[in-house]
Design a protein with these regions (language model features):
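Ribosome large-subunit tunnel/peptidyl-transferase-proximal elements
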Residues: 1-170
């Protein structure tokens, strides 16, 4: 399918990014980013389930809002700050079909205080990915670098990848 056509592209993209030493300190992290990009791609191409971008401190809001239309066409939605407690278990929202649980939740930053929220998402079958300056145990995929600037660039890179895929899929 379409997903396998992307594999050589993803590897080259990730390797080029790594060679520039922009956000990776090891080939292990490169492999993890490659896995995440493939997971996001497969979710967009093969699933009707949404991807949520959870931006806890609103740092990326302006950037992502510029591309809201393109991202929503492929079921990628900006959630913004953390959702209120009880949101995920509110049957009114989810059982009526008003909202669908995402397939993937992409966190711009995850701290130890958000462990329960991550676990609540995982209990609903959501794959949780996060960018941070250190490894976060509760995440399915913890993408981290040794400094915040590299972590920011990594998050922009992933969002840019989602935008690229949305333009490709919609043509």
């Amino acid at each position: 399918g379409k997903s396998s056509e992307w594999s050589p592209f993803l590897s080259k993209l990730s390797w080029g990014f790594y060679r520039g030493k922009i956000a990776f300190d090891s080939t292990q992290m490169l492999k993890k980013v490659d896995l995440v990009l493939n997971l996001l791609l497969k979710t967009i191409l093969n699933s009707k389930s949404p991807i949520w971008i959870i931006d806890n401190n609103g740092k990326y809001k302006n950037f992502i809002n510029k591309y809201h239309t393109e991202l929503s066409k492929v079921n990628v939605y900006y959630v913004g700050e953390m959702l209120p407690g009880g949101f995920l278990t509110n049957k009114l929202h989810f059982e009526t079909g008003e909202y669908k649980y995402p397939k993937v939740a992409l966190f711009s930053f995850v701290s130890a205080t958000q462990d329960q929220f991550v676990k609540d998402l995982q209990n609903k079958g959501v794959i949780c990915i996060g960018c941070s300056c250190n490894w976060v145990e509760s995440l399915d995929y913890s993408l981290y670098s040794n400094n915040s600037e590299k972590t920011n660039i990594l998050f922009y890179f992933i969002i840019s990848f989602l935008l690229f895929v949305s333009k490709y899929k919609n043509h």
